[in-house]
Design a protein with these regions (language model features):
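Short, acidic/small-residue loops that bind anionic groups at enzyme active sites
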Residues: 114-139
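A generic local structural motif
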Residues: 21-24, 79-81, 120-125
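Short coil/turn connectors at secondary-structure junctions
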Residues: 30-32, 88-92, 104, 128-134
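An N-terminal, well-structured beta->alpha segment
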Residues: 1-61, 65-66
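Conserved small/polar residues in nucleotide/adenosyl-binding loops
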Residues: 140-146
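Short coil-to-helix leader/linker segments, especially the first N-terminal amphipathic alpha-helix
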Residues: 9-17, 110-120
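N-terminal small/polar loop signature for handling phosphorylated ligands or for N-terminal nucleophile
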Residues: 47-118
Length: 146
């Protein structure tokens, strides 16, 4: 497949090595301090994490990390990341991984702008404000039978 860009209003960048341009994209949206969420250490072992973090630094974006997001993420991990985001003064959350990382990023982004317990959102409290959310690399793959 050929590289392409799509925006409606969500921007999608697709193509080889696009993860190495995350700093550029996030800088365009005004990100300055980002909490990076990821699942397993494979993200680091593959070099993907460092590629993304390096590009963020090259664009003047500070970052901290919270790894270990599991499938069917726990509220305790979300609360941990919310506390980190608040202490750091994050203005955005960057998800590297699959659906569980992205789901966690959404809860963290809302929780970081809320004075109560993030669990309140799951009980029906409406979200009034949230940090910016970026999904760097989706690890959700599709396998077709041959």
């Amino acid at each position: 497949m050929y590289p392409f860009s799509f925006q409606n209003p969500t921007r999608i960048e697709f193509g080889l090595d696009k993860e190495k341009e995350m700093g550029k994209y996030m800088h365009e949206y005004g990100a300055k301090k980002v909490l990076i969420i990821y699942g397993s250490e494979r993200v680091k072992q593959s070099g993907l994490f460092e590629d993304v973090a390096k590009n963020l630094r090259e664009h003047g974006i500070e970052n901290i990390e919270c790894g270990g997001v599991k499938s069917n993420p726990t509220i305790s991990k979300v609360r941990e990341a919310v506390a980190m985001a608040k202490a750091f003064g994050a203005d955005s959350v960057l998800s590297i991984g699959g659906g569980s990382c992205l789901d966690s990023a959404k809860a963290i982004a809302a929780g970081a702008c809320y004075n109560g317990d993030t669990w309140d959102f799951f009980k029906g409290t409406p979200v009034q404000k949230a940090l910016m959310i970026f999904d760097a690399v989706s690890y959700t793959h599709l396998t077709l039978p041959t």
